[in-house]
Amino acid sequence: MTVEPMVFVVDDDRSVRRSVVRLLETAGLLVEGFPSAEAFLERERPDGPGCVVLDVRMPGISGLELQRRLTAAGWSTPVVFITGHGDVPMSVEAMKDGAVDFLLKPFDDESLLAAIDRAIARDRALLRDRLQLEELRVRYD
């Protein structure tokens, strides 16, 4: 049985968040939107594959800070950044911290969907590798 991937959209701009959620739902993905990093952090950690679409600049906890917190907490869910205020150093920082992509607003739908597909594929591979490693540990312990 295959678990359907979940995409989390975290953006303080309601119109952008709603637009991205609608696009992803239309593409057949399971989606959950959040108006802030704080709201997202209140959610339980996902069990299955997926990714997080993050706005870089948000009030309170920024997207970059949220990415760091997720990594520190052991979340391996891949991140796709979206921003209207990106620059090269910011995108380099995000990519070094493990982001799959860094898209500037306005972005085209195909670019976002392709980035999400890559992120989900990466997460599925990581989850599969972890499961195989755990099976080996059980077998040889």
What are these regions (language model features)?
Residues 2-5, 13-32, 72:
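Two-component/phosphorelay signaling modules centered on CheY-like receiver
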Residues 8, 47-53:
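Active-site beta3 strand of CheY-like receiver
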Residues 35-36, 61-68, 86:
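Acidic catalytic/metal-coordinating carboxylates
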Residues 42, 64-75, 93, 97:
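Short amphipathic alpha-helix used as the core "switch/output" element in two-component signaling
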Residues 55, 83:
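Active-site residues of response regulator receiver
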Residues 58:
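Receiver (REC) domain active-site loop signature in two-component systems and cognate sites
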Residues 87-89, 103, 107-117:
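C-terminal output helix
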